[in-house]
Amino acid sequence: MKYGFVRVGAGIPEIRVADPQYNVEEIEKLILKAQGQGVEILVTPELSLTGYTCQDLFFQQTLLDEAEVALMKLMDFTRSMDMIIVVGMPVKCNIGLANCAVVLQKGKIQGIVAKTYLPNCNECAEKRWFTSIHDIKDAKVWLCGDLIEIKQRTVFNTPSCSFGIEMGHDLLAPVPPSSHLAMMGAEIILNLSAESTLVGKDDFLRKQIAAQSARCIGGYVYAGAGFGESSTDLVFNAQALIYENGNILAENLPFCTEAQ
């Protein structure tokens, strides 16, 4: 924190579907870039370690194992860093697979948050692969050698701020998890997302984030999936947005084919 401000960032890596080792290397490049810019909290898109569009490959244990190996590599890479990094990955629990955000700092897992609302209509079929946190009920999982509880609503406290996490479609729920998180004391909301792009959807999303950041009286950092995701059924525009109290502070260049 400097002069009462917290520098946050939304990093959109160039990824390869179902290639966690490549993806973690791209995320590491973004971390170094963010570190040079003094970023204190960096959020990446939904399922950034594996790619969002793996589809039935999420059922393969090999992919889940490779994602965990990639996370361990990222933990080693960030061991000497004060920056908080949030990445997305699938995590196997007692009743299925959870779509999770993993919070890292100084080489340690600070917490795991699972997605609440799984879109399952039109072009989306997340319930085919994932289980909502509503059904998991705060299960404990072994990840990278540690027994960690998967949470639904957690406020992470740092010396400079407090923040909470929601994922993708959670924002569009009648009562988003971020509303509860704000009432629990979260000053900043991080959203790991992989919302597909449609005509007019970008403007709709901006309005939703502006309204929610104003309603929560805080900051909102949105990182959307981008280049490298499969375009078989969907299009991703790598949208990244930062809002505060209903006002936009930063927005990236959409449809960029490079990491940013």
Positions of PLM-derived features:
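Enzyme catalytic cores with a strong preference for nitrogen-chemistry domains
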Residues: 1-260
